[in-house]
């Protein structure tokens, strides 16, 4: 268990299967030293936000909601091929700041081994902010995560990918 060596962690939590599974394991491993942080912005569908909040409440996770301001970044708004970098840069910047304020040691995301094969500029933002990807470290694929999420009775185990609303617009 990659998380066993951590003292505390903030999980970038969207309510999708990857971050839900990661948060569930973090909660089991770190207890009150884990915090799910959800980002609210115009890029996130309201149904996705509500589902994420409901899951966090039902699982009794510590959670916090922040508002990200990627829409204020002209680099994001111009909608080029690196749009996701600027969104994740905003998110991870806020999460690192929050972790420093609250005394958490790490910021984690739910990236998995399958994500490494895709074009993911957001992974560069994670690297820049020293965000860890424990599911990659543990060599978990999406299929692995769905399997273990189902065993943990996470409602999101078979949820289809739900990328942000901005990703539905071509570059």
Region annotations inferred by a language model:
Residues 139-171:
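Mid-to-C-terminal catalytic subdomains of enzymes
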Residues 1-151:
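ATP-dependent adenylation/nucleotidyltransferase module used to activate substrates
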């Amino acid at each position: 268990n990659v998380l066993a060596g951590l003292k505390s962690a903030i999980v970038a939590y969207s309510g999708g299967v990857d971050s839900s599974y990661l948060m569930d394991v973090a909660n089991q491993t770190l207890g009150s030293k884990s915090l799910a942080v959800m980002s609210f912005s115009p890029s996130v569908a309201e149904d996705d936000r509500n589902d994420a909040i409901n899951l966090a409440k039902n699982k009794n996770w510590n959670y916090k909601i922040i508002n990200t301001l990627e829409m204020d970044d002209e680099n994001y708004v111009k909608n080029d091929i690196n749009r996701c970098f600027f969104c994740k840069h905003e998110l991870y910047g806020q999460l690192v700041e929050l972790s420093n304020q609250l005394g958490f040691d790490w910021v984690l995301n739910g990236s998995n081994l399958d994500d490494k094969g895709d074009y993911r500029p957001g992974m560069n933002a994670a690297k820049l902010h020293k965000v860890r990807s424990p599911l990659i470290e543990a060599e978990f694929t999406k299929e692995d995560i769905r399997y273990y999420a189902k065993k943990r009775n996470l409602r999101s185990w078979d949820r289809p990918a739900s990328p942000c609303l901005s990703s539905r617009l071509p570059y």
